Design a protein with these regions (language model features):
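Metallocofactor- and cofactor-centric catalytic cores in central/energy metabolism, strongly enriched
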Residues: 1-150, 154-304
């Protein structure tokens, strides 16, 4: 089966052809937003990170922003740097450039302030839009699709209808050679043993058990019980009685394919060393902004 998309220099195929304007730190977000508002065809990938964080957190933010920039739906990138942030904006530029994707960078402090940076950014973003606007869609195989799947407003019918349909779609794409990612580690509780039985080997099974136990351990270290937050009031109103019942419905969206492995939050499907195929778990929170960002960072062109 085929679809039509935008072939990238790294071999991936996008369903969209957007210029992403990415602030390297929250302090540059207003400038990035002003640029996006003045350039048709540009989208802003705003966030509240990048400063006054510990080194492991800053590395994760940098890795995530690089992953978002390398998503196949992004045709070109403008990085908006402040100049004194903790994130590694130079590495962002280098890795995006090394992947063959058109990229520009502006520095607010280096340019002499906000107004000059906005003007320079508008020029740069508009130039990138012009640069990629002539690219045409071409035929690609469905095996090049990376699909991410997530629950939405779970209720008593999720495990009987919507998640079953998602599971069928996931199995179909895997059978065609594509990649499917699912996450929401908080919604594996009580059903992790079922996922572990679907692992391709014992190492993957152990990893699935570990991420669930580690998530619960972190909550307990703060004096919290995950079962006090799950299921949510909306889930209960919809007919769910426990986190175990919610999890049993949630995991149905992954279908029945063998689970190939567990990906860390900023980990990407496509790297210079490999292209992950089949069904994968991504260790993520259940909250939409975090999980959807993580899925886009992995390279998902489509989210359901």
């Amino acid at each position: 089966m085929k679809f039509y998309g935008y072939r990238r220099a790294d071999g991936s195929v996008g369903c969209r052809n957007l210029v992403a304007v990415i602030p390297s730190v929250v302090c540059a977000a207003d400038v990035a937003q002003a640029i996006v508002q003045n350039v048709q065809g540009a989208v802003g990938l705003f966030h509240h990170q990048g400063c006054s964080q510990l080194p492991p957190d800053l590395k994760r933010v940098t890795d995530t922003l690089i992953g978002l920039a390398l998503n196949p739906n992004v045709g070109a990138v403008l990085i908006v740097s402040l100049g004194c942030e903790g994130t590694d904006y130079a590495r962002m530029f280098q890795e995006i450039q090394a992947a063959g994707k058109p990229v520009e960078i502006i520095g607010i402090q280096k340019l002499g302030g906000v107004s000059k940076a906005i003007a320079a950014g508008i020029d740069a973003a508009a130039g990138l839009v012009r640069k990629i606007s002539g690219q045409q869609r071409e035929e690609a195989d469905l095996s090049e699709v990376v699909l991410s799947i997530k629950c939405g407003a779970s209720d008593a019918t999720s495990g009987m209808a919507s998640n079953c349909a998602l599971g069928y779609a996931a199995d179909k794409l895997v059978s065609l050679g594509g990649t499917v990612i699912f996450g929401e580690t908080t919604e594996f509780i009580g059903a992790e043993h079922i996922l572990m039985r679907r692992a391709v080997n014992q190492e993957v099974a152990d990893r699935i058990g570990f991420i669930v136990n580690w998530m619960e351990t972190r909550a307990k270290s703060l004096g919290c019980d995950m079962r006090k937050g799950q299921p949510t009031p909306g889930n209960i109103e919809g007919g769910l009685s426990s986190i175990e019942e919610k999890s049993l419905g949630a995991i149905l969206k992954s279908g029945t394919s063998p689970i190939q492995g567990v990906m860390e939050y900023p980990e990407r499907v496509r790297t210079s060393e490999e292209i992950k195929k089949g069904l994968w778990i991504k260790d993520t929170p259940g909250r939409e902004p975090e999980i959807l960002t993580g899925m886009a960072c992995s390279g998902a062109q489509i989210m359901m």
